[in-house]
Amino acid sequence: MILVIEIGGTKLQLGVFDPSRSVLVHCERLKVCRTAGAQGILNQIESALPSVLKGLDVERCGIGFGGPIHEDGSVLKSHQVTGWDCFPLAAWVREKTGLPTHVANDCDAAALAEARYGAGVNLTSMFYVTVGTGIGGGLIRHGQRQGTDRPAIAEIGHLRPGLLSNLATDTVESYASGQGIAQQVHLLALEVGRWLQTGQVTWEQLPAFGQLQIPIPTMDQIQVSDDWYRSLESDKLTTEHVAAAAHEGIWLAKTPLQLATTTLGWAIAQMATLVAPQRIVIGGGVSKMGDTLFWQPLRNSFAKYVFGPLRDPSLLVPSLLGDDVVLYGAAAIAMPPQA
């Protein structure tokens, strides 16, 4: 049996994986309190370990972590939660459990999971993208993770979307992740307020939206958008709120989603043009928005920007392992490499 742990930006999962049956036999899901930082998450793990391990013959541990990882299993940093810089995560878990412990970036782990157990089975190459709180990627060739000797690889979320993106914070993740979509809604809401005050509607303050050639909204659309935004607790805005409003046709919700899927499709097209994977598997909470809001516009954007001979939108498929993908990946990295 294998102790498996996922440490993300908003969730924490611990479970036990049975490699003889390739199934999770136990799983506990916890919410991450970001304000408590890394120490808060470590406290949660330590508190949960006794109940997770009780009565089970566990021999090793695998961890998928939301950030770049050193070869020795220590954390380089987290882009979501403070306090992780240079933390010896593998050594800490070994000390608490006595188990041989392996740590990988969560997207690399998820990519390996889909290749072994999910949508990438029997393929020689596969690229995995997670679109959740952040955006990450993992590349698998011949059943093996690529870049294991490097602190990061296939970090599609940290691509700069175009030559005019001069700020380090101006990334694919800043437009297309769950956090990024919410932030773009907030920025666009500020513009909506200005438009209502001045009666002048321009994209001067938000050039990324202007580059999409989105038609100027009517004053009725602007007013409905402003009313919707004011009805929310803005500090608790989620992609679920945005998706629900977009389905209702609210312009302020639909427009950032258009920016998100266009930007992400562009980024996936760049990766596909460079490495030509047989399949591109996409997971994470944002990918659950459905065909109309996510998959159809994403595939359209991918087809627009990818190199012609690789223009096959059917290459983009959803994850088969869903919310458990990183736990399956944590198990895979803890097992001996496959021949």
Where are these regions (language model features)?
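A conserved active-site-flanking secondary-structure segment within enzyme catalytic domains
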Residues: Q146-G162
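Conserved A3 ("GATE") glycine/threonine-rich loop of ANL adenylate-forming enzymes
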Residues: T10-K11, C107-A109, T133-G136
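General beta-strand structural signal in soluble alpha/beta enzymes
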Residues: T101-N105
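A short acidic/small-residue loop/turn micro-motif
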Residues: K31-C33, G83-W84, A152-E155
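Adenylate-forming
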Residues: A110-R116, G137-L139, H158-R160
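ATP-binding/phosphotransfer module of carbohydrate and carboxylate kinases, centering on a glycine-rich
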Residues: M1-R60, H70-D72, A91-L99, A113-S125, ...
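Short beta-strand segments
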Residues: E6, G62-G66, Y128-G134, G138
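A charged helix-plus-loop insertion that forms the helical arch/lid used to bind
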Residues: S74-D85
